[in-house]
Amino acid sequence: MHQRIDNTFEFGRFLVRRFMADQGPQSAAALTYTTLFAVVPMMTVTFAMLSAIPAFKGVGEQIQFYIFNNFIPSTGATIQEYLLAFTSQARQLTWFGVGFLMATALMMLLTIEKAFNTIWRVRQPRRGVSSFLLYWAILSLGPLLLGAGFATSTYIASLSLISGPYALIGVGTLIKVMPLLLSVAAFTLIYAAVPNTRVPLRHALVGGVFTAVLFEAAKQMFGVYVSYFPSYQLIYGAFAAVPLFLLWIYLSWMIVLFGAELVCGLSSSQQWRRRPLPRLLVMLMLLRNLHERQQEGRELHLRDLHKAGLRLPEDEWDDILGFFEQEQLVCRTGSGGWVLCRDLNHYSLDQLLRCNPWPLSARVELPEQLNEPWYPTLRRSLELLQQEQANLFGGSLADWLQANGDKKRQ
């Protein structure tokens, strides 16, 4: 029990370190700035898509009212009036103006994907058709699905099974928790679809639940602060709603990005969370897997390593394979896998060490045991190498500099 609690706190510290290393607060600030410009275009696109279908007439305004009542603190009433006025004016734009609004909405989606790719260590963003289809699906199908879901829930809520004398027990409670369930579904979809990498659905679901609960708690605390500490009105006066709304957007993005760190961290085994293996050991383990696959006539994918128990992060996989490719040790196949393209019988460990761009691991960084047949010999060799290095270069730097100066004077 104590070990599980320690692991939980250790994992939490790991997530906080990753969140700060990935510049989470800075990314949240950038997304807040982008959201400020994109919220009106997104609402305009949503209303335009829904108004194009007669069955969804008036649903857009109901969705907006529902969102502001359930997902934004009580200070959002003033902002809602502003946004409604801006949106009604935006509907009168020309085609050029509509194109600009669409570009602004796309810019927000690009910023979100960039932030998520940073968290997942994805170097190649979506390009071309795949990027266009994803964003078009969000901008076109998203409002339609929202409208269909809202219309369906409104119809169900009007049935006698819910509001009549024969109402089923528990259905009313289900209606009350519907905003939380919608938040879970939305965050799960975001974490599973936006990063340009494979995200296990169960991890995305865990992140969706965590983010939705944290989001709801933050909304309640934010509302309490606004209600009981109104000193901000003395500073901003009639404009107090605007900075509060910006602060809420910033906190929301902080929560979303931290949830993304959680989803990404769930894919790392405890060994990688606590102390990553030295790069040299990972390179040799990777070469062994590549060599075994070559003997079987198969290629190697990152998912193959994960199935074998080596939870190698994607960014480290890319770094090491990039180095191997530079040394002409591996080649990428047409299906995205990797194979050896050099005979390892004619490539020594000394060559690998001399070309290795990462420093050799110190003795304290080496694990006591590793399930690899070559590790005991390598560990002893590295210890002997470090001992010899200490004997040769153990003198003080001042002595070395003085000795070099004496040689120059001679």
Swiss-Prot record:
Name the membrane topology term.
Multi-pass membrane protein
Q: Which UniProt keywords apply?
A: Cell inner membrane, Cell membrane, Membrane, Transmembrane, Transmembrane helix
**Cellular-component GO terms for this entry:** plasma membrane
Q: Name one Pfam family in it.
A: Virul_fac_BrkB
This protein is called UPF0761 membrane protein PST_2825
In which domain of life is the source organism classified? Bacteria
- Coiled-coil region: none
Q: Which residues cross the membrane?
A: 36-56, 93-113, 132-152, 167-187, 204-224, 238-258
Stated family: Belongs to the UPF0761 family.
* Listed NCBIfam families: PRK01637.1, yihY_not_rbn
Query: What's the source species' lineage?
Result: Bacteria, Pseudomonadati, Pseudomonadota, Gammaproteobacteria, Pseudomonadales
Q: Where in the cell is it found?
A: Cell inner membrane
